[in-house]
């Protein structure tokens, strides 16, 4: 039996698969596939429809947005995911981004590389401390909770949240104040963390009307999925002073073009989808995904 593996996984998980399956990196013979382990690869209907022996598509993470889930359901192929196991790593990146944005580290580094060393008393390098500020959460899943916990413990931040699927009482139980609109969240927050799933309802969710209402000192971090934040509108917001700075680990089209003006802004930090890239996260997530391969194929590990 063959298992399609789209990208690198933890060596321990790879070894488990290799002992029992032939591992392939292409869809040349979908009829031979018993399972797939997917990180970011696209799995279209055409592949699923021609894979009669496929028992499971095991996501190496949470989001299923690269999978034709309707086709998977039609052909009776479960799509598993691993919520929560990558949250510590992604939350650490989100917090690191906020710290770097607040201290303008990209701007300062670029200035130093250009020969500047005139920071003493220079107004453009002065910022507010993070203690006692307000964090806004777009989404209230595992990553959002982890970000809030870290920032509350370290900086005693107040937390607002936007999640129409939750009640005010549920948010209050977490110690958050629920707001009704994204515009209100962006207006009242000093920092906003985006941690929601990409779907039709969230595509382009954060856009020009939201930025128009924002606190001009706002720092925005997106470690969830590209497409949730409208990148053109974000560029306008960053270059016209609607918000102060932003960071993103994800893009609508990955990789973004090397000449994309957004990624070259001094007040924008871009990373290439590294949120889950810690040894610990990789170990947890990879092995849980492989657990599902064995579970659904019925192969007994030895």
Region roles according to the model:
Residues 140-141:
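Glycine-rich Rossmann-fold phosphate-binding loop(s) that bind the pyrophosphate
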Residues 1-80, 207:
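An N-terminal-biased, well-structured beta-alpha scaffold segment characteristic
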Residues 75, 83-134, 146-154:
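Phosphate-binding beta-alpha-beta segment of Rossmann-like dinucleotide-binding domains, i.e.
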Residues 154-172:
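NAD(P)-binding Rossmann-fold cofactor-contacting core
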Residues 73, 80-93, 101, 107, ...:
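C-terminal helix-to-coil terminal segments
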Residues 45-48, 166-261:
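Rossmann-like adenosine-cofactor binding region
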Residues 7, 161-165, 224:
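N-terminal Rossmann-fold cofactor-binding loop
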Residues 39, 60, 97, 194-198, ...:
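Short, well-ordered coil/turn residues at beta-beta hairpins
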């Amino acid at each position: 039996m063959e298992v399609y593996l789209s990208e690198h996984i933890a060596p321990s998980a790879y070894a488990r698969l290799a002992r029992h399956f032939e591992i392939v990196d292409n869809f040349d013979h979908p009829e031979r596939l018993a399972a797939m382990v997917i990180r970011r690869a696209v799995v279209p209907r055409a592949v699923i429809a021609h894979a009669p022996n496929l028992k499971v598509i095991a996501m190496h993470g949470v989001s299923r947005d690269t999978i034709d889930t309707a086709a998977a359901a039609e052909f009776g192929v479960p799509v598993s995911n691993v919520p929560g196991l990558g949250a510590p790593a992604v939350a650490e990146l989100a917090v690191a981004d906020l710290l770097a944005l607040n201290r303008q580290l990209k701007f300062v580094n670029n200035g130093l590389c250009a020969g500047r060393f005139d920071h003493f008393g220079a107004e453009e390098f002065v910022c507010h401390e993070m203690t006692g500020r307000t964090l806004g959460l777009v989404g209230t899943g595992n990553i959002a909770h982890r970000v809030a916990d870290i920032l509350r413990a370290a900086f005693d931040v107040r937390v607002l949240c936007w999640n129409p699927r939750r009640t005010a009482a549920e948010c209050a139980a977490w110690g958050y104040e629920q707001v009704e609109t994204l515009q209100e969240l962006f207006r009242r927050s000093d920092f906003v963390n985006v941690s929601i799933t990409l779907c039709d309802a969230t595509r382009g969710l954060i856009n020009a009307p939201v930025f128009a209402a924002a606190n001009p000192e706002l720092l925005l971090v997106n470690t969830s999925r590209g497409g949730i934040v409208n990148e053109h509108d974000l560029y306008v917001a960053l270059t016209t002073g609607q918000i102060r700075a932003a960071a993103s680990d994800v893009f609508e089209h990955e990789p973004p073009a090397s000449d994309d003006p957004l990624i070259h802004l001094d007040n924008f930090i871009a990373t290439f989808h590294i949120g889950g890239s810690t040894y610990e996260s990789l170990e947890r997530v990879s092995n849980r995904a492989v657990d599902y391969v064995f579970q659904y194929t019925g192969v007994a590990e030895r």
